[in-house]
Amino acid sequence: MKDNASPVAPVLHQDRPNVLPLEGDIDLHVSPVVREALNAMIKKKPKRIVIDLSRATYIDSAGMAALILAMQEVEGYGGKFFLSGLQETLRSIFEISRLDRTFRIFPNVDTALAASESSTILARS
């Protein structure tokens, strides 16, 4: 595990129960915890889930896989799955892997939440 990897489970905030903030490195060591948090959210079948990556510094293939699986599950029951707040390093990783074309990505959580309320979801940031 890298020094800035998130060693603890992501914390959901009461005022935004469908927003999952992630921080540090989302890698092989942390992705099982992320997956567990996502599974707990998905079990409730919310109409939307927003992943806040504004404090995440790195993501590897295990982290990407956790997000892809979650997105597929959410969209499978008719929900919406958004990513928000990607910093330049993460944005580059998503662009290189072309996953920026797969995920709905927004500049911040508020924009993602607003988009999830509208009937038309337009741009990826």
Task: Give the location of each predicted region.
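Short leucine-rich amphipathic alpha-helices used at interfaces
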Residues: 8-9, 48, 117
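A charged, well-structured terminal subsegment
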Residues: 105-125
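Conserved catalytic submotifs in the C-terminal HATPase_c
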Residues: 15, 54, 110
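Amphipathic alpha-helical interaction surfaces in cytosolic regulatory modules
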Residues: 25-103
